[in-house]
Amino acid sequence: MVKLAFGSFRDSLSAASLKAYVAEFIATLLFVFAGVGSAIAYSQLTKGGALDPAGLVAIAIAHAFALFVGVSMAANISGGHLNPAVTFGLAVGGHITILTGILYWVAQLLGASVACFLLQYVTHGQAIPTHGVSGISEIEGVVMEIVITFALVYTVYATAADPKKGSLGTIAPMAIGFIVGANILAAGPFSGGSMNPARSFGPAVAAGNFAGNWVYWVGPLVGGGLAGLVYGDVFIASYQPVGQQEYP
C-alpha cells in the first residue's frame, strides 16, 4: 500500500530541513563529480578510446567508493539519499513527505548539474559523457534500469530504513556503494547503469544533450517506487507502523 503524504511547508522549510537540502546538494555534487570525473579521466587516458573491461571496472569502483563516502557524509543530516529514485522509494514507503522529497530532488539535481559544469571547467572543456543505451532498445534500457534501481533501493531499505536493521545500519553506506558498483558492472555496457536520475540529468544539462534522458527518469523512479512498495508492505508493515520509524 502506497503511503505517500504531502507534508507541510512549515516542516519542509524548517532549519533542519534546510540543512538537509544543503547536505544533499553537497554530497550529490561530490558523488557526481567523482563518478563523471572517472569517465572523463578514462577517456583522457585512452585518448577517447572505447570503453573496455578495465575501464568499466575502474568507473564502477569510482562510483561505488564515491557513493559510499557521499552517503556516509550526509546520512546523519539528510539520510544520505543523493538520488531522486531513492527519495521517491522512501516517499512511497512513508519515510519522507512529497513536499520535502521535491525539495530533495531540487538539491540533488542542482548538485549534479553544478558538478558537471565544474568538471567541464577544470578539464578545459572536455566533453561530458552522457548516459545512453547501447546494443539494446530504449524500452529494454528502461527495464534494465527498473531492475538495478529496485536492487539499489531495496538495499537502502534493508540496511538503512528497516527499523530492525540493528547494527546492520553501520554498513549501510558500504552496502549501498557495493550494489551500485555491481550494477554498473552488470548494466554499464547496455543502459549505462545509472539508477539515478540526477546522475544522468547533470551530464545532460552540461552537455546540452537530453536524447534518451527519459529512460533514466522512468526506469529508476519505477524501480525505486516498486522497492519501496514491496519492502514497506511485505516486511516493515508486518511488524511496525511506518509512522514510528526514524529514517531518514
From Swiss-Prot:
Repeat among keywords: yes
The entry's keywords: Cell membrane, Membrane, Repeat, Stress response, Transmembrane, Transmembrane helix, Transport
Location of the protein in the cell: Cell membrane
Annotated transmembrane regions: 20-40, 54-74, 97-119, 141-161, 168-188, 217-237
Keyword Cell membrane: yes
Principal subcellular localisation of the protein: membrane
UniProt cross-references to InterPro entries, sorted A to Z: Aquaporin-like (IPR023271), Aquaporin_transptr (IPR034294), MIP (IPR000425), MIP_CS (IPR022357)
Positions of short motif NPA 1: 83-85
Induction: By salt and osmotic stress. Expressed in roots with a circadian rhythm showing an increase at the end of the night period, a peak during the first part of the light period and then a decrease.
Organs and tissues of expression: Specifically expressed in roots.
Membrane topology: Multi-pass membrane protein
Pfam families, sorted: MIP
Protein family: Belongs to the MIP/aquaporin (TC 1.A.8) family. TIP (TC 1.A.8.10) subfamily.
Function according to Swiss-Prot or TrEMBL: Water channel required to facilitate the transport of water across cell membrane.
Name listed for the protein in its UniProt record: Aquaporin TIP2-3
Organism: Zea mays (Maize)
